[in-house]
Amino acid sequence: DISLTATARLFAEQFERASGIKLPIKKEAVTTNYIALVVDKSLPKEGYSLVVQPERISIVAADYNGALYALETLRQLLPKEFESTTPVKTDWAVPAVTITDAPQYAWRGLMLDVSRHFFPKEYILKTLDRMAMLKLNTFHFHLVDNEGWRIEIKKYPKLTEIGAWRVDQEDKLWNERTPNSANAFTNPATAPKKYGGFYTQEDIKEIVAYASARGITVIPEIEMPAHAMSAIAAYPKLSCHKRSIGVPSGAVWPITDIYCAGQEETFTFLEDVLTEVMELFPSKYIHVGGDEATHTEWEKCLKCQARMKDHHLKDVHQLQSYFIKRIDDFLVSKGRTLVGWDEIMDGGLANNAVVMNWRGIEVGKKALEQGNPVVLTSDCYIDNYQGLPDYEPQANGGYLPLKTLYHYSLEKENLSPALQKNILGTQANLWAEHVGNTEHSEYMLFPRLLALAEISWTTDNLKNWDNFINHTQTFMERLDVMKIKYARSIYQVLPTVENQNGKIFLKLECEVPNADIRYALGDTPIEKATKYHQPIALNRSTTFKATVFSGKATNTITTGEVIFHNAIGKKMSYSPVYHKKYQGQGEATLTNVVRGTKNFQDGQWLGWLGDDVTLTLDLEQATEVSEVRIGAMDAQSSGIYFPIKFAISLSTDGKNYREVATHNEPCIVRGKPSLKDFALKFNSQEARYIKITLKNVKTPPKGGDAWLFIDEVLVF
């Protein structure tokens, strides 16, 4: 079929590169030793059948994408050397199989943030190749954010002349970068080094065409009304305050520099921009962001207040809704469909708009009940760590290992079949605040994109973790040939300490079933490690080392410490009670000897939002004490801060307390998550009750939430 020529050519060209064997593409029938491609529109959309026999390979596909995916399946049946860029001598054998397949979901995507860090066109094209290999069909191109405008708009050249460039602070962690002056580059003699880049319209045309040939739709994202400081830096008149600002080099929170919703100039600008964008991107969908706007400028702006009065809008949330609906009307008039993050529902939303759900399934369910199509992404943020943070490159504060992503289900039990049908699919989101180069990007993408590909293609009843992880390890050999710098976090040993009725056990596991885990306690070197079979009973404090072996250590050596102390198993009371979102293991959390990790969602942390906290520990009998340690977390990208003051008071009767130690901890900006045991020492004395007072920072230096997280109280 002539419509399948392009996909046949893609396969033939790669096979020739890898094997040196040319596969001619012919329209006329041949009798033996051929690959036949036939269209059968009765098959499900993007579906195919693949039959491999000794004399022929037959492919019947529903459409272009179906044929493409059949050939991608054939690619994976061929030896891994198929991925070579130079000819390799090997046995190019394919097992005899019959496969019939079709995707469960229409939207199988990847979002790549190129604003926070810019990635060259060549890397985008490579990423599209890799998406096609995994049968992903939607590339969400995050082209605009505060930290950089990445697409040429001919009517507004300053968007790339100014908005695409910022002061180079790449030597600093994202959350430690300082604000930039609007005049930073005015004087060439004193101007700092620039960081940035953008895609010309010719680049965009090439990317879109390249994607289309691989069955991928490119959906551009042009953020509004917030995440637009790069545009406001170029054209200050677009804001309410009209002040010149610099393009930020790092974290901005809260986002108060947003487009003015009260002036017509803003909508003229956005319609002009979107008109050029739509000329470049033929996709049905146009993403407009719509998230994380702080409306303080709208509340002060006379034009915004006049707009609210004229349109009978009761608050700034309804003004945000007006803003999004107006852009929606414009896109609909051009035959396109608006997509936005789930904040676009605030204040009401047209039923045709697509909601990209990121704030949890309950918000997604609300969108479905309103009749909106939904893309579920809340548990697919691959900017989060995929292994223990101490052994991983810098990432966002969350934790999303391969196994967790694989078990993400789009089949929600609390949804009716009618609502379930409105789930378009899912995508992985790779935000790039901490991802500064292509190797780091590859590391975050692989192997997690394999899991994303399976959960967006396959129904839950056909998923099998053991099979998947075995296939993943085999697929890693293919990634090696492709020279992809993927993560090996699945081989990382994950230690947990369990308190079973007062008995303490060290449990070691990793994501690979039946892995050969070896461990050593205390000063024993890892070379003399013991094979792990079952949880290790402990009766005293110890350090440990553990790794996975395959003839030798296959990954980073995980280290840790278990500390025994006088408060284990003792009762703790809390004032106020910890937040319902972060309840750890309940009341016993802080005295169970089990320590939290840098993953604040690991179930071992108690959290308080904005509160000062008083903890009261009952040791059950008078005990000689001289030191109290409080385990705390600082993860400022997630709004978590160390307490700024600690106080220890002792009592023998639970009524009369005497303060014995205090400590003040300055609140400083930290770019990485940090764990610390704050040790308060005092003269040895008897006490049964210990009162620990913790002061919350309440107003962080960069704004936002002020969480206080504690995992253990240790008494000596």
Language-model segments: what does each one mean?
Residues 111, 140-142, 217-221, 260, ...:
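Structured core elements
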Residues 3, 118-120, 146-152, 225-231, ...:
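Flexible loop/turn segments at secondary-structure boundaries
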Residues 1-105, 440, 456-467, 473-478, ...:
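Contiguous, structured surface segment used for ligand recognition
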Residues 105-336:
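Substrate-binding cleft of carbohydrate-active enzyme catalytic domains
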Residues 63, 548-552, 696-698:
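Surface-exposed loop/turn motifs at beta-strand-loop junctions within extracellular Ig-like
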Residues 338-353, 359-505:
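Flexible, acidic glycine-rich loops studded with aromatic residues
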Residues 597-661, 665, 672-716:
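Aromatic, loop-rich ligand-recognition surfaces of beta-strand-rich domains
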Residues 38, 459, 463-614, 633:
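Short, compositionally stereotyped local motifs that mark structural "simplifiers"
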